Amino acid sequence: MNILGIDPGSRNLGYAIVELNNSHMKLIEAGLVKIKPSEFQYQLSQMIEGLDMVFSSHSVDEVAMEDIFYAYNPQTVLKLAQFRGALALRIIQLHGNFSAYTPLQVKKALTGKAKASKEQVAFMVKKILGIKKEVKPLDITDAMAVAITHAQRLRLKR
């Protein structure tokens, strides 16, 4: 089963496809859709086109997306919410449904602590998926973490 993990951001869209086979997880692909600075509607379009490319190049059985987090800047929260809404609509159109996890849920699922740092999460992602090299930027490891969180939830449901 292939799980697509998505980390939407205001500048980039991190994505990761993790294969879940019984209790074993394997990274299939991970990457970043870079959003070029431009007017907002063009940024939305870039993000959706990037998501479309991921769906067209891989078989996806489950989709999980990180929920937006609180930010001090209201404009940032608004922009992230609009990006997430556009992504949610496109995922529903292409796939039918998705699961959402808050950053705290993801951190707790991977490290056991809801207040874990991004570096602690990245360490656990690499350990779980058997990745030896450093993964940058953290948008990519966040997407991997979302996919792993969803895989763990699916295993618990069985």
UniProtKB/Swiss-Prot annotation:
Instruction: Please state what the protein is called.
Output: Crossover junction endodeoxyribonuclease RuvC
Q: Where does Mg(2+) 1 bind?
A: 7, 139
The UniProt annotation places Mg(2+) 2 binding at 66
The cross-references to Pfam families, in alphabetical order and at most eight, read:
RuvC (PF02075)
- The main location class comes to cytoplasm
In terms of CDD domains, this protein maps to:
RuvC
For activity, the cofactor(s) needed are: Mg(2+)
What is the enzyme's main class? hydrolase
**Keyword terms, alphabetized:** Cytoplasm, DNA damage, DNA recombination, DNA repair, DNA-binding, Endonuclease, Hydrolase, Magnesium, Metal-binding, Nuclease
Which organism is this protein's natural source? Nitratiruptor sp. (strain SB155-2)
EC number(s) reported in the record: 3.1.21.10
Locations listed in the record: Cytoplasm
Name the chemical reaction catalysed here: Endonucleolytic cleavage at a junction such as a reciprocal single-stranded crossover between two homologous DNA duplexes (Holliday junction)
Q: Which family would the database say this protein is a member of?
A: Belongs to the RuvC family.
* GO BP: any one term: DNA recombination
